[in-house]
Amino acid sequence: MTRPNILFIVSDQERQRDWLPEGLSLPARQRLIDNGLEFTNHYTHTSPCSPARATLFTGQYLAEHRVTENSSYPTNTELPKDALTLGKMLREQGYSTAYKGKWHLEGRPDPDMEAYGFSDWTGNDQQFWGLAGSGTEYDEPIARDAADWIRAHGNDDEPWFLTVGLVNPHDILWFPIDQPWYWEQEPDRYEFARNQMGQRDWGRADNLPPFTHDLDRWFTDLPANFDDDLHTKPEVHRSWMAGWLGVYPYLDLDRDDTDMWLRQLDYYVKLHQLSDQSLGMILDAMDDIGGWDDTILIFTADHGDQCGSHGLRSKGPWNYQETMRIPLYMVAPGVTRPTTTSHSLTSAVDLARTIAEFAGVNVANIPTLQGESMRPLFEDQTAKIRDYVLFSQEWAWWPGVETCRYASSGMFDGRHKYCRYYGVGGGYNAWGQKFAGDEMLYGRDAAFDEHDHEMYDLQEDPHELVNLALDRGLRHDVHSRFGELRSIEHQVYANGF
C-alpha cells in the first residue's frame, strides 16, 4: 500500500486478555485477532492515563514529554501545544487527521485539538476522562461519531488517520458505586453519583443509575495473588490505596467479602463486552465503505487495571503485570498475516514510530521519536526489537502519598523486572492542588540506599509475590540492576534521570 489509511483505536484501563474467562465472546476484538497480528508482551510505559497517552501520541518517554500527572486541571501537567504529535507528523505527510473520543491531555472540556494536529473532534473531554458511568454513557456516541466519520470520509481521495479514544473498561474504577443493586443497599450514595453525572452537557441525560445491565457470573476464584499483603513491597503500593480510599471511601471493598471482589471481576468482563460492542460499530462502518484493503487498523489501551490482583484496585504507582501489560492488535493488509502472534517485547513508545513509518514519514528526520520500529515483527514474529521495556511514573495522586517514595523507574527484560522507587514531595494532586514543598526530596539521582527497591523473577514467580530485592543474598544483584537501569536512563532519557 502507498500511504494507507490508518485507524487507531485506544481503549482505557484494559489489561492484556489472558485473564478473561473461557467461553467469553468478544467478537469485534476476536475479529482483529483472527485477521491480524497480536502482540502478547506489549507494555505501557507509565500507568496514569494522561502520561500514558502522551507517550502514545508523541513516541516519547515520560522524561521527555514531561506529562507526569493526569491533565485534569490547568495546574496539572499537560501536553505542550508545540509537542510533535502523530497528528502533526501525518498531517505534514498529506493525511487528513481526525480524532474522536477521549483525549485527556489538556485540562479543559474543549481541548484545542487543532493545535495538536487533529480535526473534527466533538464532545466534552472532561466527561470522557472517566467519572462514574462515563464509559457506559459515552462509548456508544463516541463510536457512532467515529462510524459516521468513516462513512463520510473513508473513501476520500486523500489518506486519513483517524484516532478513536474509547472510555471503557475504565468504569471498573467506580465499582460498586455505579451498580443499581448497590444504590438499593446504600441509598445515601445515590446523591453522590447523581451529582457526579448530573451536570453533563454532551450525551444522554437519563442514565441514573449509570449502569443497569445484569452481571453474568464468570468467576469463582479470586486472583492467585489476591492475598498479597504488600508488606514486602514498596510502601507506596499501600499508601496509594489508602490515599485513594481516603478520598473515595465508598469504593472500599471488604477484604473478606469474596463475593464482592468476584462481582468486580464480573463487572470488568461486562465492561469489555460493552466496549466490544462499540468497537463493532466502528468495524461495521469499515465494512460499509469496503475500506479494509487500504486501511491499517491498530487497537491498544493506555494501561490496565489491578482488579483485585495483589489486593489492589485501579492503576497506581506500581509496575505489576496487570497494570502494565496491555493488548495490541494490528491488521495491515499485505503486511500482517491472519491469526499470527508475537511474544516479543514491545512498548507503547514504539507505536508512534511504527505508525509514522506506515504513513511514509521519514522517521530519521524526527529525533523526538524514542521507540523502536515494530516492522521487523511483521515478517518474523520471533524477532527481537528491544532487550527490555522501560517503566516510569512520577505522580503522588492523593494527599498523603507524597510523604513516601511515590515515583518509580523500572525495566523488564522478559524475565526479570527491577524497579527503583524515589521521590518525596513535590507536584500537584488529582485536583490540581500543589502538594506541600516545592522540591522533590530523594529525587531521580538519589543514592541506592535512599530508594525502595523491587525485583521479581517472572519465570519462577509469575504472580510477582516474592520481592527478591529484600533477599540480602541478592543485594549485589539488586545493586547491579540499579546501576544498569541508571546507565540506561542516562543514555535514553535526554532530559536527565
Per-segment meaning from a language model:
Residues 13-22, 155, 166-294, 298-345, ...:
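Active-site-proximal cap/lid insertion segments
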